């Protein structure tokens, strides 16, 4: 009996102690709530369901009965205190209980939006506030309610691609709205009752989504203890947003400058169609810059100079211009030597006879079409012809040679020879006429040789000569008169002219002159 009575007394003592502890807890809670200026029933309105910390466990907790005494619970107004689904939350931050904040500090909150099941009296569910309404913690009647996280991290940074946002710490909430008081209550209520501004700079980034009656935009303004101010991710300042191009190392301003420079270079390289052709020709160099640079680099390497000439455009242009001037000088000298070769140096005299002969020769022939050399050769041939006629005349006077046109000549052998010669000339004239131009008009002098003999030949020769009458003896020998003769290469520049111009150069022409004389045929 003593054991039974002892057990009953111990159990009764434990019940009394637990009841005393519960009464002490209730008195402490009411005292702290009165310090904040609120009542216990306002805490039920905040979270839309009864809290196990005020009524024991969550299953048997009931709201306060207004008709009963303070601290007693009644089931009359249990359903009336629960808000309907969809009603906005009315949070009074001035009258928050401190026991809720102290209990949360001792609880290890999970990262995310899950609700911890209360394990006993006085336990507080752990929830996290996020911007996505689908990931918020909910009460048994599917009504969202915010729950602060742990004390350690007052703000957690998330990447741009993640849909979750930074969470708010209950410690900061206590410091801002707790015992120390609030300097500007209306400003805090406005911050937590408006939607956060959207990110207009990056449309791909997830836009913040607030819950009913709660705004988390000011959470980003709270400085983080783990990161410095320079490394913070500013989501509300468009000028400080981390752009994807800047994160990749792309400088937009530098790229624009390069693009503008390329456009200017392209416009200077390819002039417009409205530009005059002379200016465009002046800008074009004689040689290709690539070939000039390759040649200069090869010669410089042979002399021990290592330099890249491809990048120096001004040097290449200067070298091309100098080569053009040097070639122009060589070609000018070559043309001068060609003229001197074809035309002799005229004699400069002040005599009237020379002036008359010069004027008469200029009127008879075009000096531009016939060279002085051809004229001198023709004069020499005319003098030789006159000498030959005088010699033949002397032989005929001495009887050493007979005239072929004499009609009294009755030698049959001579007559037969004359007939054969006449037929031969006629055949040659016919063949020449057929081969050269068979369809042209026939003149009398073309067929006069076949019937008349050497007398007509002298007439034709005299017409061609124009100066002196040709002898019949010379005409019988087949001489049709003198003509002007021009050299085939007389009006062009030859290898001799070019070699003469290169020999005048002092440096850099030795090898070229040797190769030229080796290729010279005549």
UniProtKB/Swiss-Prot annotation:
It is found in: Nucleus. GO terms for biological process: transcription initiation at RNA polymerase II promoter. Residues 358-371 have a biased composition (Low complexity). Residues 26-42, 456-468 have a biased composition (Basic and acidic residues). Residues 57-68, 105-117, 125-172, 209-237 have a biased composition (Polar residues). Its main location: nucleus. The keyword Hydrolase does not apply. Residues 293-379 form the Histone-fold domain. The keyword Nucleus applies. Signal peptide: none annotated. InterPro entries: TAF4, TAF4_C. The 1.2 MDa TFIID complex is composed of TATA binding protein (TBP) and the 14 TBP-associated factors. Functions as a component of the DNA-binding general transcription factor complex TFIID. Binding of TFIID to a promoter (with or without TATA element) is the initial step in pre-initiation complex (PIC) formation. TFIID plays a key role in the regulation of gene expression by RNA polymerase II through different activities such as transcription activator interaction, core promoter recognition and selectivity, TFIIA and TFIIB interaction, chromatin modification (histone acetylation by TAF1), facilitation of DNA opening and initiation of transcription. This is Transcription initiation factor TFIID subunit 4. It comes from Debaryomyces hansenii (strain ATCC 36239 / CBS 767 / BCRC 21394 / JCM 1990 / NBRC 0083 / IGC 2968). The lineage of its organism: Eukaryota, Fungi, Dikarya, Ascomycota, Saccharomycotina.
